Amino acid sequence: MTLTASSSSRAVTNSPVVVALDYHNRDAAMAFVDKIDPRDCRLKVGKEMFTLFGPQFVSELQQRGFDIFLDLKFHDIPNTAAHAVAAAADLGVWMVNVHASGGARMMAAAREALVPFGKDAPLLIAVTVLTSMEASDLADLGVTLSPADYAERLAALTQKCGLDGVVCSAQEAVRFKQVFGQEFKLVTPGIRPQGSDAGDQRRIMTPEQALAAGVDYMVIGRPVTQSVDPAQTLKAINASLQRSA
């Protein structure tokens, strides 16, 4: 579905669904995007697509009415991370993220870089523990905490730095809502409708389970992008979430 809209007049959606665009072919990506409605989801653009197609690709998605989560996971010295986050805000994206493991000074600098944008600033989210990581992966890095405990430690640091929320696994959402409050946004990848393949995610939930756990925004990729009828798949997911609410 093609709409004409600027980044300042993006279509508004109440859906918590964020579709991950993981394509290496621009035409294939746009063919998919033109099948879905910006009222049914937001879109996530990650490292591969942004590196291949650049800021213009983000602008084209916005012109079709979509809010964009720019998933580049900035992790650098504070000044560089701050400039990168400000550049994302200049693009008019809805959400941008950094790695919480970059530390307090980096996250604080990123937050401060968004102050001049006022109400037009994107949500600033920090990545805690990648959902593909298990305890053995953390142990290889010298981290003796469980993924859940380490994610909570990083989430606490994120909130202390004044960011809007974190990317976390759905399993961590219940505790995070209790500890950090309702206003602290939880963004969760690894969401798979019932019957979907787990893919490369290790800690997964269905959309209904994620909503019940307190997830604010759920990232769904292949179950939608590889669907024979992605528009209908999105509508079915949103309908199931409304029934569960």
Swiss-Prot record:
It comes from the Bacteria. One of its GO terms (biological process) is 'de novo' pyrimidine nucleobase biosynthetic process. InterPro entries: Aldolase_TIM, OMPdecase, OMPdecase_AS, OMPdecase_bac, OMPdeCOase_dom, RibuloseP-bd_barrel. The active site is at K73 (proton donor). It catalyses: orotidine 5'-phosphate + H(+) = UMP + CO2. GO terms for cellular component: cytosol. One of its GO terms (molecular function) is orotidine-5'-phosphate decarboxylase activity. Keywords: Decarboxylase, Lyase, Pyrimidine biosynthesis. The keyword Zinc does not apply. Pathway: Pyrimidine metabolism; UMP biosynthesis via de novo pathway; UMP from orotate: step 2/2. CDD domains: OMP_decarboxylase_like. Its EC number is 4.1.1.23. Substrate binds at residues 22, 44, 71-80, 131, 192, 201, 221-222. Homodimer. NCBIfam families: PRK00230.1 (NF001273), pyrF (TIGR01740). Belongs to the OMP decarboxylase family. Type 1 subfamily. Catalyzes the decarboxylation of orotidine 5'-monophosphate (OMP) to uridine 5'-monophosphate (UMP). HAMAP family: OMPdecase_type1_B. This is Orotidine 5'-phosphate decarboxylase. It comes from Escherichia coli O6:K15:H31 (strain 536 / UPEC).
